[in-house]
Regions:
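Extracellular glycoside hydrolase catalytic/binding regions
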Residues: 2-5, 19, 23-40, 44-170, ...
Length: 204
């Protein structure tokens, strides 16, 4: 009723080594929760230096398990910390209601990564930024306001859904809470973005 979605995520860097466990997990999750239309399945959060062919092969084994219970959106990670959506675009998965993961951190990643996204979309792929941060790719550092603005505008223009990293009180820049629970610099900024009050929120 409140427009909230839930992502059931296999949060790993090596899902291709645990296909059996992933099939069992997503089979049970899809059977139990797949009838809710606000549930999304992310079957491989962030492959590292894994060839796209291996990621695709893993996905082609897990997707049918979910589809036996649910037609909901399935999100598939891409190589190199879920950045190489261009490689997925050249050899996409033959399945319906699939999106591909694009991860970025505004302090590290810029136009070259958006160019990969533009290429993937030009080939017909749907993208979902299931992890992005306002800081550097190591999860730390100060908020890069200019870089975040560029990414927010690009995602808004291309109707790309996103999830910010992270709801955590770890002592690092990406956490939206400081240790102890007060909002961090990134947390304050994200709150302003979500409320549409930040000057960098394209939907304000």
């Amino acid at each position: 009723d409140r427009g909230i979605y839930v992502i059931i995520d296999w949060h790993t860097h090596g899902a291709q080594y645990n296909v059996g466990a992933a099939k069992d997990f997503f089979g049970r999750m899809a059977q139990k929760y797949g009838h809710y239309d606000n549930v999304i399945f992310e079957i491989y959060n962030e492959p590292l230096q894994v060839p796209w062919g291996e990621v695709k092969g893993y996905a082609e084994q897990v997707i049918p398990i979910i589809r036996s219970h649910s037609d909901n959106l399935i999100v598939v990670g891409t190589p190199t910390w879920s950045q190489d959506v261009d490689k997925a675009a050249n050899n996409p998965i033959n399945a319906h209601n699939i999106a591909y993961t694009l991860h970025f951190y505004a302090g590290t990643h810029g136009q070259y990564l958006r160019d990969k996204g533009n290429y993937a979309m030009s080939k017909g792929l749907a993208l979902f930024a299931t992890e992005w941060g306002t800081v550097n790719a190591n999860g730390d550092g100060g908020v890069n306001y200019g870089g975040t603005e560029e990414w927010l505008n690009w995602m808004d223009q291309n109707k790309i859904s996103w999830c910010n990293w992270s709801i955590h009180d770890k002592n690092e820049g990406a956490s939206i809470f400081n240790p102890g629970g007060s909002l961090s610099e990134s947390g304050k900024y994200l709150k302003d973005i979500l409320h549409g009050s930040a000057p960098y929120a394209p939907w304000r």
